Amino acid sequence: MAKSKNHTTHNQSRKWHRNGIKKPRSQRYESLKGVDPKFLRNMRFAKKHNKKGLKKMQANNAKAVSARAEAIKALVKPQAVKPKMPKGSSRKLSRLAFIAHPKLGKKIRSYMAKGRRLCQPKPKVQTKAEAKAPAKAQAKAPAQAPKGAQAPVKAP
């Protein structure tokens, strides 16, 4: 038995003609006549990885972004800063300082009061109807017999 070839040449030329054998680019176009094919190939790769163009594009993008940021800054007015209560060991002193402040005094008082209200645990208040309901439910349920015991038999 003969060994089979990995690469066959059978029908190869037909395959080439099916797709149309292409001439090198330098022969294909009138304008590129006499140009070195290797140079053209390199140009193709240069187009793909055009670093100079990319850098220009990035620079333009950066300019556009900075211009947009400046425009937004001009349009948006800075809002008043909310006073924040610092958390830590010096909270008491800073609280007193805030309260004594001529402008922030009122705001910080309401802000602190709100914080205190939110932190308090809410007491559970039971109504009379709710208090009676669990007691009735316990009374209605029959007492459970021990695990191995038999159910009582009713006499006829």
Curated annotation (Swiss-Prot):
Residues 1-26 have a biased composition (Basic residues). Residues 1-35, 116-156 are annotated as: Disordered. It is found in: Cytoplasm. Residues 129-144 are annotated as: 2 X 8 AA tandem repeats of A-X-A-K-A-P-A-[KQ]. Gene3D superfamilies: 6.10.140.1730. GO terms for cellular component: cytoplasm; cytoplasmic side of rough endoplasmic reticulum membrane; cytosolic large ribosomal subunit; cytosolic ribosome; large ribosomal subunit; membrane; ribosome; synapse. Sequence repeats lie at residues 129-136, 137-144. The modification N6-methyllysine is found at K5. Signal peptide: none annotated. The keyword Cell inner membrane does not apply. The modification Phosphoserine is found at S31. Keywords: Acetylation, Cytoplasm, Methylation, Phosphoprotein, Repeat, Ribonucleoprotein, Ribosomal protein. One of its GO terms (biological process) is fibroblast proliferation. Transmembrane segments: none annotated. Residues 134-156 have a biased composition (Low complexity). The keyword Ribonucleoprotein applies. The modification N6-acetyllysine is found at K33. InterPro entries: Ribosomal_eL29. Its main location: cytoplasm. PANTHER family: 60S RIBOSOMAL PROTEIN L29. Component of the large ribosomal subunit. Component of the large ribosomal subunit. The ribosome is a large ribonucleoprotein complex responsible for the synthesis of proteins in the cell. This is Large ribosomal subunit protein eL29. The gene is Rpl29.
